[in-house]
């Protein structure tokens, strides 16, 4: 049996899964992510409008990765040692690798604007959008006039 090179992919959403898929069966791939679910973010705005529910946008990450012939580890990476080829996780495990891909996604950039953290709701995950939807329902049911401001013109803001 041929010893395949080991690749650790940190992060299991779009970029991480695309990488794992591309690596196919030529490599022994371990995808490490703290969440058991892959979140289908292109339809995330449909949570706010109530067209979709959170469970429709979450898929079991382990099943998706197993279908590719790879291993999924639900854990949080706490350290990478590129020289030694090791990834350490919160549970205390160490995963050896010949190559490592870091695909942990992005964060909302508030550009240091005052009040952003206090007065806005993030739009980056299924939970974020479900919270926005609940907040809008509460505001509409209050009978008061509701104004919504979208800050940002990226894909999520446009949707």
Can you describe what each PLM-predicted range is?
Residues 1-4, 69-147:
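FAD-binding core/adjacent interface of flavoenzyme oxidoreductases
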Residues 2-71, 148-149, 155-159:
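Beta1-alpha1 glycine-rich phosphate/pyrophosphate-binding loop at the start
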